[in-house]
């Protein structure tokens, strides 16, 4: 495959690494795990790399994740907003919590779901202890972050902030069609070409 420098490099690493490298060559990034700092660092790096390689072509983010760290997810979100490229998103299997947030944060008109994907929206929560002062500080931070996420989801879905806040107080599950109606996505995917980046390149040595 060719890297951002145009130098042809042989595949190395495990089969999973080879698949990830092949998809990255097609401008496809996969979020297929819980969102943590390590996953966020990898995805942010991939977004920045693909943007540097071509700042005009779309990048696709495929999501099958139960969610995870809010700070890690916001790092991915901010990187998606930072780069000039449109980032299309696709829900596969499960887009839960932070996975749902990143799904709805895709470029308008380019947010997709497979027909039987499940999408979960809820407010973040965490167990914490310590002194009364520590608990109060942490609770205040959790409330501020929760308010931020609700505002951003409302912005990306077109729903009133009050409705998003109310709907996310408890687990709110969506089918693909329900997510479409709510504004979390723009299309239920029928053809792979609908979500494949226009700048995707055919891999040398890989048969169709």
Regions found by a protein language model. Name each.
Residues 1-98, 105-208:
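N-terminal organellar transit peptides
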